[in-house]
Amino acid sequence: MKFSIQKELVDVAGRRLGRAGMLETPHGVIHTPAFVSVGTKAAVKALTPEQVKSLGAEVVLANTYHLYLEPGAERIKSFGGLHKFMNWSGPIMTDSGGFQVFSLGAAYGKQVSKVANQKNLRALPASGLRRDEDFFDAAPSLVKISEDGVSFRSHIDGSLHYITPEKSIEIQHNLGADIIFAFDECTSPTEDFRYQEEALERTHRWARRSLEVHKLKVNSKTQALFGIVQGGREESLRKRSAEFMASLSPPAGGFDGFGIGGSFAKEDMETAVKWVNEVLPKEKPRHLLGIGEPEDLFM
């Protein structure tokens, strides 16, 4: 994968406001900034691949968790990978499955999304950042998180599964997307600082493990691996995470790009992006995970 900046916007003080670039993958070029069409189960809902392309989409994102459960990464590999399986000749991204850990765990049954709004956050006590045990214990969790990985029960049939950073990378290699993501823990926007920090450090250890196993795979020559910046709504944690991911990503190695992961309040999204953009290496691409509403495109 090769990324080149074609144009940069700067203000009178020399601060970077935005940029346009070209991301070259084995299946074509992505012109950035780009909206990534979501094809959760290897298909964009209600559209054929030809229609998706005719609308100007250059890249589609498929969901690792859902494809792992149905029809299975090995089966997709037997078809020749995602591109042949979904009849899409352009670039494909797959996420790590980290958001599904969140949706089956901290958010399960609580109507809290990874990008919260003020209505969600009003569920917190007045101090705003204390963990509200009644709120978090009000619904069951289908997930158990440990240092090694995550155990969870399928939302389809209740069967027990276990995913580690190494297994997430293996699944994504079998799927064969052009851009894949390191395994991470996506926390709730309503978690307190203590847990956000604990999860952040775990995500960093998982990132290192994801990168190490990726380097051993033959596919690492053709698949780009992005590390994910976490840290919730905390500036210090966001910047710490960006610094850590950058430290694993020298210009000629390490992560090929970065995802900016949830969670944060929608009202804080622009600020959170600015925090990490000040730290992440300029020469590598970034992807803002978990957005998609029209107003999100005009931060």
Specify the residue positions occupied by each region the protein language model found.
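Non-catalytic, usually N-terminal nucleic-acid engagement modules in DNA/RNA processing proteins
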Residues: 1-217
